[in-house]
C-alpha cells in the first residue's frame, strides 16, 4: 500500500514527521483529505485548523494548528504552522475558555484545540 510522507512543523519546534495513509484538515477554501499520490498543491490553513493524520495500525494523530500553510508535492505533505499542539498536550478547560475570548485569534486557537480533543466538530 502506498504511504504518504508527512512533516508538520511549527515556528518553535518540529511537531511530527512520519508516514500516513490519509491526512485531513481545513483550508481557507474548504476541507481537504489527502491520500498518497495526491496532485501537488499549496493551500492556506484556517486559523482554527485541526489536522488528523491516519496511520496504518496506529491511533490517529490529532493536532491543533494555528494558521499556516499546507504543501503537497510528489514527496509528500508539509504543514508549516504558526503554532501546533498534539491532542495530548491540550488542557480542554483552558481551550474552552480561550474559545470564548473576544480576541478573534485567541478564540480561533481555542476552537482548534477543542477540535483536536474532539470536544467540537
Swiss-Prot record:
Extra facts: Was identified as a high-confidence drug target.
One Pfam family matching this protein: ATP-synt_DE_N
Listed name of the protein: ATP synthase epsilon chain
Taxonomic source organism: Mycobacterium tuberculosis (strain ATCC 25618 / H37Rv)
Record function comment: Produces ATP from ADP in the presence of a proton gradient across the membrane.
Gene: atpC
Similarity remark: Belongs to the ATPase epsilon chain family.
Taxonomy of the source species: Bacteria, Bacillati, Actinomycetota, Actinomycetes, Mycobacteriales
Keywords per UniProt: ATP synthesis, Cell membrane, CF(1), Hydrogen ion transport, Ion transport, Membrane, Transport
Subcellular location: Cell membrane
CDD domains named in the record: F1-ATPase_delta (cd12152)
Membrane topology qualifier: Peripheral membrane protein
Keyword Phosphoprotein tagged: no
Annotated GO CC locations: peptidoglycan-based cell wall; plasma membrane; proton-transporting ATP synthase complex
Coiled coil residues, start to end: none
Quaternary state and interactors: F-type ATPases have 2 components, CF(1) - the catalytic core - and CF(0) - the membrane proton channel. CF(1) has five subunits: alpha(3), beta(3), gamma(1), delta(1), epsilon(1). CF(0) has three main subunits: a, b and c.
HAMAP family assigned: ATP_synth_epsil_bac
Record-level Gene Ontology MF annotations: ATP binding; proton-transporting ATP synthase activity, rotational mechanism
Family matches, as InterPro entries: ATP_synth_F1_dsu/esu (IPR001469), ATP_synth_F1_dsu/esu_N (IPR020546), ATPsynth_dsu/esu_N (IPR036771)
One GO term of the biological process aspect: proton motive force-driven ATP synthesis
